[in-house]
Amino acid sequence: MKKILVIGSLNMDQVTKVHHTPKVGETVVGNGLELIAGGKGANQAVAMGKLGADVTMIGMVGTDDFASQLLDNLKQMGVTDKVMKTDKAPTGTALIMVNESADNSIVVIAGANGLLKPDMIKPSWFDDIDIVVLQLEIPLDTVAEIIKQAKARNIYTVLNPSPATHLDEDLLK
């Protein structure tokens, strides 16, 4: 079985249902609030874990209750956790409004995800790894360093270019 390494975001999604998405300056009433383990990186790892893949997740969370819940979720879904904790920022969150047509509007607050810096990437993370999976909810310079290190080892790399942003062409080669 191939070994997969996901390096990316872990967020606590705070989801509410609304009749319609508010316009500028408008306040709308939400229907309930649901806390759901999320983050593009964690979602990728969990999906592969549910399928029985040998997957490891690396990212950063705070030292708060959301961090504990997110790490418990990874474990329950069969994902090996090598997530780092920091007291310098809270765990990342996403504020999500879902309207009656099931269209959503999302605001992501990076929190600890934004503290995963290029100089923190360890060559040992890539030992015995067959596939690296990334997305863009961690700093772009960190993504570039991860791609560089994976490429140097000829590791197949998957980049989910979301949230959308301009990417240097060299990053995609």
Label the model's feature ranges:
Residues 1-60, 67-69:
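Glycine-rich phosphate/adenosyl-contacting loop at the front of the ribokinase-like
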Residues 65-77, 96-98, 102, 122:
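Active-site-proximal loop->helix
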Residues 73-88:
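A glycine-rich helix N-cap at a beta->alpha junction
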Residues 78, 111-119, 157-164:
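Short gly/ser/thr-rich secondary-structure transition/capping motifs
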Residues 86, 96-131, 136:
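Conserved phosphate-binding/catalytic loop of the ribokinase/pfkB sugar-kinase fold
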Residues 131-173:
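Conserved beta-alpha-beta core of the PfkB/ribokinase-like small-molecule kinase fold
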